[in-house]
Amino acid sequence: MHASSPSVRPIQALSDQLISQIAAGEVVERPSAVVKELLENALDAGATHISVRLEQGGVKRIAITDNGRGIAPEQLPLALARHATSKINSLTELENVATLGFRGEALASIASVSQLTLTSRTADAAHAWEISGVQSIDQKSTVAPSSGTAGTTVDVLDLYFNTPARRKFLKTEQTEFGHCAEVVRRIALSRPDVAFSLTHNGKTIDHWAVNDIARRSAHILGNEFSAARLPLKETAGPLRLHGFIGLPTASKARGDAQYFYVNGRFVRDKLLMHAVRSAYQDVLHGDRYPSYVISLELDPALVDVNVHPSKIEVRFRDSRAVHQFVFHAVTRALAQTSATAFGAAPSPTPAPSSALPWLREQQQSTFAPQFNSPYGVAQSAANYGALFANGPASNDSNSAAPSLHTAGSHGATTLPDDEFPLGFALAQLHGIFILAQNTKGLVLVDMHAAHERILYEQLKHALDDNELQVQPLLIPITFYADGMEVGTTEDNQDILHALGFDIAALSPTTLAVRAVPALLKNADAQTLARDVLRDVREFGGSRVLLERRNELLGTLACHTAVRANRTLTVPEMNALLRQMEATERADQCNHGRPTWVQLGLSDLDKLFERGR
């Protein structure tokens, strides 16, 4: 084809305006992207109060005002220029960037697809100055005096007015506003030291005053999360993790309450989400999603934030170490839970000293330390250790749970030391539930679910204490593999051996599985190997092995646990309570359902309308 053909054009340089509009396709995906970029600029400027005003879901207008450092008038034209920024000036600074923004392209991209006005005033300036974005190559920006307090206001009108094709892809006004409001919530959660206000079509939607993360998260995520959250605080070398995670019993049907931050930046990172999900994997019911607000802080040099145009993904220098740190931190936090109050959400346990250590607080409550125990069961816990066995139910009349009318034959007993938060058994209900009494009131226990969790944790610990048994295959399983699978196999032999696998590359397109973990010897070796290789490649380890192992142990525990309608003696019931107190995660069964609830004295008063 000749160069003179009308279908072929000569190579030519694009105009700055067109370049900015092309870049806007990635940076300014929808109105919420504009809100995000402008809020990040305000925070980088040191703002302590930020106002967000929207009209028609942000399409008609987005105006964001802050009280930050402001921009000097001579630098206003540079603020709207492409690839101009005050945040970095070298590759070294880029690799150690600590600010939310750094590319210097957001304002130029936004100005290319809207009517933008930037008004700013520094603290030492006599008045504010403003500049408008240019809409054609013939137009020039001019800086003019204006009114305004110290700080910056960016006013974005008629978004996509000059790119009508982009407007066609926008959703309804309420949908676009919902996305904008979610961006404000995300950033407000990351900076509780900054006050935020949000207005839509002249109506105030939200206002968040300066406070701590506990109050800010309660304000944004609601009382349900506030009542069912666990504190998270871990440090290991250069890594620091803090925030709140929701209890498994307060999980949600959608993953819309998951907020993870890396050095103050909200991210949707597969590695981090995988680590959190792995920690929850044997305490969540079905396809439920946990809620959390987690912040990870580390040296900026250890994380690359220049991975995605929206900066929502990051890359860690040592991804495996970060994954393991987050996984173990969340796992330890989930092991510290307390009772589920009757008719209320579960509450966290602040002390890490035992599986259920909240009774120290109850010991100091207004409840009397003495209560009547009808069966005289307040005896040493050592007497219960060997009683709870899975033999057949006894036909002896003494093995049946005593009826409540026998209570009067026993005198009052004293509540023992505070290592018995679940109290002591009173009776068994319909062969399913255990009724127990503690200083706070009445405890209701699902005995099968509780025993299932106890056995499950015991099986896991027993397996973890021994070396992983490997089962060599009599005939190796060979299968076709792509280049990534072969490369992962060759580069990660140590990890694969630690997981109990012997996988070798026979050719550039063939892998052979020679050994698998003995516990999974009946699984499909090819499918198992592919799943493990995928996890090792993406996360530096495999959740597949843990999931398969836990599925088998969970099934074994379920079939071994005491069944419904089995009559237990009072000592057997007390032995189960003691085992629950000594077992991590005893508050949920293997499927994420609660194993016990607390019915407090105040709850009983309400049921009988006492005190009215």
From Swiss-Prot:
Superkingdom of the source species: Bacteria
GO cellular component terms attached to this protein's record: mismatch repair complex
CDD domains to which the protein is assigned, alphabetical: HATPase_MutL-MLH-PMS-like, MutL_Trans_MutL
Transmembrane stretches, start-end: none
Keyword DNA repair attached: yes
Gene name per UniProt: mutL
Keyword line: DNA damage, DNA repair
Organism name: Herminiimonas arsenicoxydans
UniProt GO molecular function: ATP binding; ATP hydrolysis activity; ATP-dependent DNA damage sensor activity; mismatched DNA binding
SMART domains named in the record: DNA_mis_repair, MutL_C
Protein name, per record: DNA mismatch repair protein MutL
